[in-house]
From Swiss-Prot:
Protein name: Tyrosine-protein kinase Drl
Reaction catalysed by this enzyme: L-tyrosyl-[protein] + ATP = O-phospho-L-tyrosyl-[protein] + ADP + H(+)
Compartments, record wording: Cell membrane
Protein role: Probable coreceptor of Wnt proteins. Involved in neuronal pathway recognition and ventral muscle attachment site selection. Non-vital for development. May be part of a signal transduction cascade involved in learning and possibly memory.
Organism: Drosophila melanogaster
Keyword DNA damage: no
Length: 610
């Protein structure tokens, strides 16, 4: 009995030690100057996450221009990490600076690192700073910890005079001072640049015992910083005058009234400006101005009989956003895991800056396409490949190419497998290849569009919003059978199709609906809009939509009613179906089941004469 008890005790000890992998906390100095309490605040204590602490957005008063964290790996080796920082207002708080690399290792000795938060001084504001820290606990099992810390930085306009004079040296000195006594190299790295510009050494200090509360109060601490209590509203400097509030309110009221007038004008205007029921076009090279196309209009061009009716306003299906659910992501990853030794690469199909697509075989018998990354790819790029490749997980449909398996034995260069024969190739590359695409007829284009509409109806029925429907995210074989696939690696392989509007996020601006551009709202209707652009791509042999328009001007042009022009040799009936997809309101666009009916009826109509 005694040996059994000893064995159980050893097992429990091993389990406990396996869980105690990480400490992340605010040290005494940091808690005292931010909150005014002499204590250590733990976010992760011996592997256990403190959700209450993570949910609290710590206020950072105007007289404090940096924040610090302390961490330590409790296992016998450093733990890989990556850090991302975002601010809610880049004009007021433009450039947080880390004093460690964005990607590195959590050391086995306690280390304090910090972030400089220097306001621009342009106006009074409270800016939310989001700090995302991902720590890889075990590469073999893909065991990651993702932590999100929030800080509310108070920025005052009065800081404008000194903002540019003291920014570079003072912030770095503050961060360097914060790290002394906790050991480790001192690096100052820009948020967008991992080039090390300074390096120093400090002897490591032993880890202190946990302090839960100290009798030392703020009255004994002294100094202006410690007397400032950020939790007391009266200590915050109020805005300069109530006049600012009055002016802002007046401007908002004028904007609201103008918007209502504009909506009323647009709703009534077309019938007065265009007495004919036909579609009147104002062409400007590859785009044109289109009036609102009524779903009940009977014009001389083409109307799909009684099938174009508003549908999206009453939809109540929940849509899956698995990328915000780490448990679901890990479950999918475990189910799709395959052995890398069973995958053989035969030839390189497509190559980007870091992305690679190969042809190969799985188990020496099944032909596959393999998406992977080069050795120099960052951890964030690897994570994005894995997340986006599982977007169509378990989407079983003849016209959907979903992921077959994933190998993460070498987490730096994972393999993502798709079942595909040797004749399968990217649809955009196919359209731009003169030897293939010019032989495609209108009838075949309509059939290809019908296949993709069926694929999208299947995804929507299962609560999946694609968000990036385009020719680059489709494949086609030598029988002109097309399949919709995910957008993994598309930003790297087709960089000209993605643009950033100054927010650091690269999106397919020329394919997005108005609501997706304005508010990043993605829904069934936004997918329909992108499908219309995809049909235009197929008719123009893979041309870039809105090629003459600057990405920053896209929202303005779409709000003014401009849409893609009718391609050369595109029948009026087919272009009318596209135009329905580009209605300004999502509820006015057809569903994919309605699009299938329209394409099917048009196919029947044109085959009568063949």
């Amino acid at each position: 009995m005694a040996p059994n008890l000893l064995t159980i005790g050893l097992l429990l000890t091993l389990i406990a030690s396996g869980q105690a992998h990480l400490n992340i906390f605010l040290n005494l100095h940091e808690v005292l100057r931010l909150i005014g309490v002499s204590a250590e605040l733990y976010y992760v204590r011996e592997g256990a996450i403190n959700d209450y602490a993570l949910n609290f957005a710590v206020p950072v008063p105007a007289n404090i221009s940096d924040v610090t964290f302390t961490w330590q790996s409790l296992v016998d080796h450093p733990l890989p990490y990556s850090i991302n920082i975002a601010t809610s207002d880049t004009e007021v708080l433009p450039r947080p600076i880390l004093n460690i690399s964005r990607i590195g290792d959590v050391p086995v000795e306690p280390q304090t690192w910090g972030i400089a938060l220097k306001c621009s001084g342009t106006r009074n504001a409270e800016v939310t700073v989001t700090i995302n820290v991902e720590v890889i606990l075990d590469r073999a099992t893909n065991n990651n910890t993702n932590l999100i810390f929030k800080r509310k930085k108070i920025c005052l306009r009065e800081e404008q005079d000194s903002a540019h004079e003291e920014y570079d040296d003072d912030d770095l000195d503050l961060l360097q001072t914060a790290r002394k006594g906790h050991g480790g190299d001192i690096h100052y790295v820009d948020r967008n640049d991992e080039h090390v510009v300074a390096n120093g050494h400090q002897a490591p200090e032993k880890q202190r015992p946990v302090v839960t509360e100290s009798p030392v109060g703020r009255g004994n601490s002294g100094g202006s910083k410690r007397d400032f209590d950020p939790m007391l509203r009266e200590n915050l400097v109020p805005p300069a005058s109530g006049l600012v509030t009055l002016i802002v309110g007046g401007i908002l009221a004028l904007v609201l009234v103008s918007t209502l007038i504009l909506i009323a004008y647009c709703a009534k205007g077309p019938s007065k400006r265009h007495p004919s029921n036909g579609v009147h076009l104002i062409k400007t090279s590859s785009f044109q101005r289109l009036p609102t196309i009524s779903s009940t209009a009977h014009n001389s061009i083409y109307v799909c009989p009684s099938t174009i009716t508003p549908t999206y306003a009453t939809l109540t299906r929940p849509f899956r956003e698995y990328e915000h659910e780490p448990e679901e992501f890990n479950r999918r990853l475990q189910e799709l895991t395959v052995q890398k030794c069973r995958v053989r690469l035969s030839c390189l199909v497509q190559e980007g800056n870091f992305g690679r697509i190969y042809r190969g075989t799985y188990n020496d018998c099944q032909e596959v396409l393999v998406k992977t990354v080069a050795q120099h790819a960052s951890q964030l790029q690897v994570n994005l490949l894995l997340q986006e490749s599982m977007m169509l997980y378990e989407a079983s449909h003849p016209n959907v190419l979903s992921v077959l398996g994933i190998s993460i034995e070498d987490y730096a260069t994972p393999f993502v497998l798709y079942a595909a024969t040797g004749s399968v190739r990217n649809l955009k590359s196919f359209l731009q290849d003169p030897s293939y695409a010019r032989s495609v007829t209108t009838i075949q284009t309509v059939l290809m569009g019908s296949q993709l509409a069926m694929a999208m109806e299947h995804l929507h029925n299962h609560g999946v919003i694609h968000k990036d429907i385009a020719a680059r995210n489709c494949v086609i074989d030598d029988q002109l059978r097309v399949k919709l696939t995910d957008s993994a690696l598309s930003r790297d392989l087709f960089p000209g199709d993605y643009n950033s509007l100054g927010d650091g996020e690269y999106r397919p601006i020329k394919w997005l609906s108005l609501e997706a551009l304005q508010k990043s709202h993605y829904n069934e209707g936004s997918d329909v809009w992108s499908f219309g652009v995809l049909m235009w791509e197929m008719c123009t042999l893979g041309k870039l939509p809105y090629a003459e328009i600057d990405p920053y001007e896209m929202e303005h042009y779409l709000k003014d009613g401009y849409r893609l022009a009718q391609p050369f040799n595109c029948p009026d009936e087919l272009f009318t179906i596209m135009a329905y997809c580009w209605a300004s309101m999502p509820a006015e666009r057809p569903s994919f089941s309605q699009l299938q009916i329209c394409l099917s009826e048009f196919h029947t109509q044109i085959t009568r004469y063949v």
